[in-house]
Amino acid sequence: MEFREQVLDLLAEVAENDVVKENPDVEIFEEGIIDSFQTVGLLLEIQNKLGIEVSIMDFDRDEWATPNKIVEALEELK
């Protein structure tokens, strides 16, 4: 499976919403698709399933505002 697909699948699982795969430019925080509790879960899942450690201190909502931005950020970290 392609890395991008893995990230989008993981995001859809955490968000419990497939809109993140259907519209990867959706503003996930502004639209209320992911809240702060789910953000922590997302970071844990990224570490567990993708082996990429992202500290909550390194997490920036503006840089992670859309699924596409999340894929880009993780590409740089892997």
UniProtKB/Swiss-Prot annotation:
Entries under Gene3D superfamilies matching the protein: ACP-like
SUPFAM superfamilies named in the record: ACP-like (SSF47336)
Alphabetized Pfam families for the sequence: PP-binding (PF00550)
Source organism superkingdom: Bacteria
Keyword Phosphoprotein: yes
Main subcellular localisation: cytoplasm
Keywords: Cell wall biogenesis/degradation, Cytoplasm, Phosphopantetheine, Phosphoprotein
InterPro entries, per the entry: ACP-like_sf, DltC, PP-bd_ACP
Location relative to the cell: Cytoplasm
Residue ranges of every copy of the Carrier domain listed in the record: 1-78
GO BP: cell wall organization; lipoteichoic acid biosynthetic process
A molecular function (GO) term: D-alanyl carrier activity
Assigned GO CC terms: cytoplasm
Residues modified as O-(pantetheine 4'-phosphoryl)serine: 36
PTM field: 4'-phosphopantetheine is transferred from CoA to a specific serine of apo-DCP.
Keyword Phosphoprotein (UniProt): yes
Pathway: Cell wall biogenesis; lipoteichoic acid biosynthesis
Protein family membership: Belongs to the DltC family.
Known role: Carrier protein involved in the D-alanylation of lipoteichoic acid (LTA). The loading of thioester-linked D-alanine onto DltC is catalyzed by D-alanine--D-alanyl carrier protein ligase DltA. The DltC-carried D-alanyl group is further transferred to cell membrane phosphatidylglycerol (PG) by forming an ester bond, probably catalyzed by DltD. D-alanylation of LTA plays an important role in modulating the properties of the cell wall in Gram-positive bacteria, influencing the net charge of the cell wall.
UniProt-recorded name of the protein: D-alanyl carrier protein
Gene: dltC
